[in-house]
């Protein structure tokens, strides 16, 4: 079995962060979202991975993943070009996949339990496809699956007004090569895209059994700033955190802290976990780093009160103010203005931006 990892798309809902880079490289707990997907595929025994590239961020993604050897996998890069839908992206991998079954994994998704169970469920029978599902509170906003008592899919409906179930498709699929014939027969939807749900429905109509696996753990599509922050919370809550860096004697550190080897917490700083602090980061005197915060590499925080936030890296924050629920892009420089107000600020700041609060 092979893996097909989608890393295209414009990331419009994550602007301004994605004006300067692909959404799949935004870090969660100081690791790019795309790396979690590669690790999930490797955990499922998949070592041949095709990475679908769009127009944006090709070089950055290739620089991160390389040939895959750092992850114990072999990576082939496949250029999709214009984003014409998930089914179009899957179709671009036809030559790479050949006669093998494959997992298709949306590279901006992250889930607790990985894809091992999804793969094992698919391999337990004779299926044309397998889909990961999760119960949601707002099924009208998702593609929805109707399943029988054996877990076989009987119908797929895209964003129904009256959904028959609350089982939503969540961006992880397993396919046999038969899906490529289904894709070739598709017509663009009203969105002008080739829809993967239409391809799966075509397999159903052609007599293929479609497996389903209901995901019990958490899952996040990290398409918006608030989704990145929630994913950061979930990962920090579950992650095994290690302190390897330097903590000064007069610093206060409570709770679960991940402190990289070359990171420093100086005298007079307060850090309360769960928190992740990357290599080269410095938490200076008078700084409070509160729960569910990730401080990226080579960042310096001084005097600020920050919590439930992601600092992507190479940033300088020197302000006496309070920053909460914020996503701060690489190279952000935030300082104080004379009229700073005491209440917390919620910010989404793009790469290399400068602010005076």
UniProtKB/Swiss-Prot annotation:
GO terms for molecular function: metal ion binding; nucleotidyltransferase activity. Keywords: Magnesium, Metal-binding, Nucleotidyltransferase, Transferase. It is an enzyme of class 2 (transferase). SUPFAM superfamilies: Nucleotide-diphospho-sugar transferases (SSF53448). Mg(2+) binds at residues 108, 221. Its cofactor is Mg(2+). It comes from the Archaea. Signal peptide: none annotated. InterPro entries: G1P_thy_trans_l, NTP_transferase_dom, Nucleotide-diphossugar_trans. The keyword Magnesium applies. Pathway: Protein modification; protein glycosylation; Cell surface structure biogenesis; S-layer biogenesis. Its EC number is 2.7.7.-. GO terms for biological process: protein glycosylation; S-layer organization. Belongs to the glucose-1-phosphate thymidylyltransferase family. This is Low-salt glycan biosynthesis nucleotidyltransferase Agl11. It comes from Haloferax volcanii (strain ATCC 29605 / DSM 3757 / JCM 8879 / NBRC 14742 / NCIMB 2012 / VKM B-1768 / DS2) (Halobacterium volcanii). The lineage of its organism: Archaea, Methanobacteriati, Methanobacteriota, Stenosarchaea group, Halobacteria.
